Amino acid sequence: GVSGSCNIDVVCPEGNGHRDVIRSVAAYSKQGTMWCTGSLVNNSANDKKMYFLTANHCGMTTAAIASSMVVYWNYQNSTCRAPGSSSSGANGDGSLAQSQTGAVVRATNAASDFTLLELNTAANPAYNLFWAGWDRRDQNFAGATAIHHPNVAEKRISHSTVATEISGYNGATGTSHLHVFWQASGGVTEPGSSGSPIYSPEKRVLGQLHGGPSSCSATGADRSDYYGRVFTSWTGGGTSATRLSDWLDAAGTGAQFIDGLDSTGTPPV
């Protein structure tokens, strides 16, 4: 796939504050077709379980489909293509060599559009992965950062420098989603970005991409997207198969948020 030229390669300076969480994000295929984005998330035991958060609408909700998925790590361009340039809107040189196959469904719920998978194999040390923290507090944040695979192409980063807004999906009344507004000249999201994480200023996952009107050509309020909230997904539909709490805090610590875990095993400073 090819993503819009306004999007920003993760190797660009805009990624400098997020080098750790960039390594938690992956593209994946569904039954042989490049499909959506997801991310590796930490749990309160800090035990490197391969929990992978994506969107319910991506359809990774049956055992057969989950077993078919191939996850592609570190799929990104090697150089910073100037945003807006023709090269930024063309195929890059990202490699699909670092991959793993298969997952099981742990929990999913349409209300906040989340699916939590557990990948079948442990992390390959050569991939240098990162398990991102999360934040389930019921609040807005002063800004946010998205890391994603637009059109399931090379990994990109988009920053929001204004406060999030709690809402329903696509402007509906409700509290299940975070409405995130992109910079006028910065990156956005696209189909294929679905399921990708939105990070708080503290670099904790607040939710995953459901959708929205954003595109490189969008302006004003249309240059925005909606993310299903970890806050909502935490209790989900009230069962272990429809909520995050049983998996991301199996010990029942009651943590409101946790930080990420690097592949070296020590939590970041």
From Swiss-Prot:
Belongs to the peptidase S1 family. GO terms for cellular component: extracellular region. It comes from the Bacteria. Highly specific endopeptidase that hydrolyzes lysyl bonds including the Lys-Pro bond. GO terms for biological process: proteolysis. This is Lysyl endopeptidase. The active site is at H57, D113, S194. Keywords: Disulfide bond, Hydrolase, Protease, Secreted, Serine protease. It comes from Lysobacter enzymogenes. Disulfide bonds join C6-C216, C12-C80, C36-C58.
